[in-house]
Amino acid sequence: MIRLAAIVLVAFALAGCGSDRSTDNGAAPTTTSTSPPSMQTVPDCMAPPDASTSTKKSSANENRETMYLTSISDGSDKCSAKVLFGFEERAPGPGYEVSYRPAATAKVEDGSGNPVEIDGQAFLVVKLTPAMTAKIDGDQVMKTYTGPNRLPGTGPIAEVVKTGDFEGVVTWVIGFDREHPFTTDWSDSQLVVKIDYS
């Protein structure tokens, strides 16, 4: 009987040694987890560093050779709206001046000064010089641009309207919902006016 009692006591002692020590003080075991690294959102579209709403973009035609407008097209993509002014294939292209102007001076016809209706709240005026939309030879007039004088817009552009073809200056106005940064570039006989979404 004494030997049996001793065996039972040893069994209880071993059971006590095998218990979880982490619960000896009554505290629950602590678990830690590592949160996944946060994802930084990078915008799909960013305006180029030279884009601006306040800076006038201009280029002079040093040869003073008249350039003839042949087309206006839309080259927009998901990040920007583009208005392409196409000319006959001649270098270096017309002189141009592109800048935002108040409605009082933007929405008028060159020469006559008559008001021109243009949709939008901000107006980017594109002046091309020396440039024309037709070749004149005596009584003969051959139009090089036969498209519309008013084109529907896309994205932030409300519409594009011709406001002048007078004394070697061709003027178009791009109406916007507000002023957007823009850049200009001459490429492949086209003046590209690029308006970035921002």
What are these model-derived regions, one by one?
Residues 1-5:
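Bacterial N-terminal signal peptides that target proteins for export
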Residues 13-16:
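C-terminal motif of bacterial Sec signal peptides marking the signal peptidase cleavage site
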Residues 6-11:
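Hydrophobic helical h-region of N-terminal Sec-dependent signal peptides
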Residues 18-198:
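Short linear recognition/processing motifs and adjacent strand/loop elements at protein termini
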